[in-house]
């Protein structure tokens, strides 16, 4: 079955576990997230970060990731090149990469409470948010 381009709003990158996607959908039925390996038949797997960020903007997707080291830098490079990215949500170091329940609670809570109404182009948010 083909995915509708507007069906999802969040894209879990290749270093984000499928278990996060499942946990989010368990907590919030029909939560608007898809993993990159299943989005459009996995055709986005292996894209360099800048190309992926630009592709996310074109598809209206916010990238969800753990890569705090390079993704913000790539997002800056995209902007300096005159392009847009679709937005970026990164988990802080305090969030364990294997604690899918905590990740899902942070992501679904933030998205449901406020994130889904935001304009995401060229925005970066770290979860958990600081007050």
Residue ranges and their predicted role:
Residues 3-4, 8-14, 18-40, 50, ...:
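Acidic, PIN/NYN-like endoribonuclease modules and their adjacent C-terminal/linker elements
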Residues 55-60, 108-112:
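A general structural signal for short secondary-structure boundary/capping elements
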Residues 2-5, 56-58:
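Flexible, charged surface loops at secondary-structure boundaries
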Residues 45-47:
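Active-site metal-coordination segments of metallo-dependent hydrolases
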Residues 49, 56-57, 61-78:
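Acidic, metal-binding active-site segment of PIN/NYN-like and related structure-specific nucleases
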């Amino acid at each position: 079955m083909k995915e509708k381009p507007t069906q999802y709003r969040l894209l879990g990158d290749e270093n984000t576990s499928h278990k996060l996607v499942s946990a989010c959908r368990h907590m919030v039925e029909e939560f608007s997230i898809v993993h990159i390996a299943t989005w459009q038949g996995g055709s986005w797997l292996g894209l360099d970060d800048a190309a992926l960020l630009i592709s996310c903007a074109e598809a209206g997707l916010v990238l969800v990731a753990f890569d705090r080291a390079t993704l913000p830098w790539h997002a800056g490079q995209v902007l300096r090149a005159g392009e847009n990215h679709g937005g970026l949500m990164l988990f802080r170091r305090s969030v364990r990469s294997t604690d899918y329940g905590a990740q899902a609670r942070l992501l679904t809570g933030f998205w449901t409470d406020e994130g889904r109404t935001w304009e995401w182009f060229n925005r970066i948010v770290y979860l958990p948010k600081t007050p």
